[in-house]
Regions:
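Active-site-adjacent structural elements that line small-molecule/cofactor binding pockets in enzymes
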Residues: 1-303
Length: 303
């Protein structure tokens, strides 16, 4: 099992640098940051841009893989974004993982104009991923679609990783699952939505795990339909009602249950002092000490 961690882009670099270096030193396999202009309950708090943050993190680390959790077409155009991706892969020495999602409702969805309908959002995401794939696998791309155009778009010399950086496609719905099966080197999910207000936390937690097993089966079906096998499966444990780093026991249980469902990777969040992802640094440090045993957990084999 590989263990990753999200560091929200809220801190000035003087502090953030120490955290990115710490997670590499502790032995995490990958580290991520969100790709938003502002995010949910933190919209009025400090929030920095994704690409320069990842470039800075790449410059002060050596081994750990780095990625977007996740980039979306809410405010990204594939042509300039592909150039950024190519640059990040170069600066990191081929350590970039490109997490991609359709983009949900909220601040980012309407910051540049009217938000798309759910159907439009799915259509746009499909074209976004298709165009990114083309841009990152060939030196010159031309495309004229419903949402995007590219005319002689150059991506030279291309990515360090070949044929391109790995796509980790976040997906829950049928169309996104099909897209992940078609283009992804990895599938990512936060798991199913559960109504935490209507039930006890422990009950909601079990409901989440049951729904996750259903999602896993649906992705298996999407893979079969696409005629591909997506090796890597990433689970954000913090899609569940119980915060992954509420205790070391909670993290251990999450890793073991994720492995039993065939996930190869889990992702947690650096604890915040209050609000979303609230937790204690001592638990993160205990988790860091326990990483070798957690990473020794083997994902269940898939047929």
């Amino acid at each position: 099992m590989r263990i990753g961690i999200v560091l929200l882009p809220q801190d000035r670099w003087a502090q953030a640098r120490e955290r990115w270096q710490a997670v590499e030193r502790w032995g995490f396999d990958h580290a991520w940051t969100y790709d938003h202009l502002a995010w949910r309950s933190l919209a009025d708090e400090p929030w920095f841009a994704t690409v320069p943050l990842l470039a800075a993190a790449a410059a002060v680390t050596e081994r750990i893989r780095l990625g977007t959790w996740v980039a979306s077409p809410n405010f990204r155009h594939p042509v300039p974004f592909a150039k950024d991706v190519m640059g990040l892969d170069d600066v990191s020495g081929g350590r970039l993982l490109l997490g991609l999602g359709a983009g949900g409702a909220g601040y980012d969805a309407g910051v540049l104009g009217p938000a798309p309908t759910p159907r439009e959002r799915a259509d746009r995401f499909s074209e976004f991923v298709d165009v990114l794939d083309a841009l990152l696998t060939q030196p010159v791309t031309d495309h004229a679609g419903t949402w995007y155009e590219a005319h002689g778009a150059r991506m030279i010399p291309g990515c360090v990783q070949r044929p391109r950086v790995p796509f980790v496609v976040a997906a829950n719905g049928p169309r996104a699952l099909a897209l992940a099966a078609r283009h992804g080197q990895g599938w990512a999910t936060y798991g199913p939505a559960v109504d935490e207000d209507a039930t006890a936390t422990a009950t909601a937690q079990e409901e989440w795990w049951r729904g996750l097993a259903v999602l896993r089966d649906r992705f298996d079906e999407a893979q079969e339909a696409a005629g591909r096998s997506v090796r890597d499966r990433y689970l954000s444990l913090d899609g569940a009602p119980v915060f992954s780093l509420s205790s070391l026991a909670a993290l251990t249980e999450g890793v073991e249950r994720a492995a039993a469902l065939g996930f190869t990777d889990v992702v947690v969040h650096w604890p915040r002092p209050a609000g979303v992802y609230a937790g204690r640094l001592e638990v993160l440090e205990a988790a860091a000490d326990a990483l070798p045993s957690l990473q020794a957990v083997l994902p269940a084999a898939r047929d």
